[in-house]
Regions:
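Helix-terminus loop motifs that line ligand-binding clefts
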Residues: 56-145, 156-173
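Generic anion/oxyanion-binding catalytic loop in active/binding sites
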Residues: 36, 48, 109
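Short, solvent-exposed loop/helix junctions and linker helices
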Residues: 38-41, 114
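Extended ligand-binding clefts on enzyme/binding-domain cores
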Residues: 142, 152-206
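Short amphipathic alpha-helical/adjacent loop interface patches that line ligand
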Residues: 44, 63, 152
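Low-complexity, Ser/Thr/Pro/Gly-enriched N-terminal "stalk/linker" regions
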Residues: 1-39, 60-61, 65, 72-79, ...
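Hydrophobic alpha-helical hairpins/lids featuring a short glycine-rich hinge
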Residues: 148-149
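Conserved H-X4-D acyltransferase segment
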Residues: 40-54
Length: 206
């Protein structure tokens, strides 16, 4: 006879909220304690939905922090490096993104140089529809939506210049399916050269 497992929805909800609290870094949520110590694009958008269930103001702060990394051309990078960490490679120094990529005169954190699937628009819409609208002004939501629109326009212009309706992915990490076996065959055909030494950090944590 199979064992019967009974899950209390409220208990699971509180456990999930505790994980968000533990991974809160003062305005953004890290996916894991050490393995992923920065703010990841679509992870953060989904975390905002979790925050909204018990702290609407914190949910919107998550979005604000993510958008601090937006480039001048509208691209929203897949990692925003709000602080340094020895536990992750490649870090901001490896990406070495030029200052010219960012709006002039605006303080910003370092970022990676690739993007991720744009789930942010859907998440922001859900935040707005489910929220009480007491922690954010309409004018700020409009500004957030304009930034997201600029990101979508970047996908259209930079990743679909021939207007095919299909967005090009330049790196497996941009797909959100980093370790999918679907990448094995195409990546095997890419010539590789190693011009610098490096040490992976994640293998010591998993």
């Amino acid at each position: 006879m199979k064992a019967q497992h009974h899950f209390d929805p409220q208990t699971l909800m509180e456990q999930a909220r505790n994980i968000l609290r533990q991974n809160d870094r003062g305005g953004y949520t890290v996916p894991t304690e050490r393995l992923y110590p920065y703010q990841w694009n679509w992870d953060s958008a989904i975390c905002a939905l979790g925050w909204q269930s018990f702290d609407e103001a914190r949910a919107w702060k998550e979005i604000r922090m993510l958008l601090k990394g937006q480039w001048l051309n509208g691209m929203l990078p897949h990692i925003v490096f709000h602080q340094d960490s020895p536990d992750y490679f490649p870090n901001a120094d490896v990406w070495n993104v030029s200052e010219a990529c960012f709006p002039h005169g605006v303080e910003h954190p370092p970022t990676s140089g690739i993007s991720q699937p744009p789930v942010l628009a859907t998440c922001v819409r859900k935040l707005w529809e489910a929220g009480k609208q007491t922690s954010i002004e309409n004018s700020e939501v409009k500004l957030i939506c304009e930034k997201i629109l600029n990101w979508h326009r970047w996908f259209w212009s930079a990743r679909d210049p021939e207007n095919t309706g299909l967005v090009r992915v330049l790196h497996p990490w941009e797909s959100g399916m980093d370790n999918s076996p679907a990448w094995d065959e195409p990546l095997a055909r890419v010539p590789s050269t190693q011009n610098a030494s490096y040490v992976r950090q994640d293998t010591s944590l998993i």
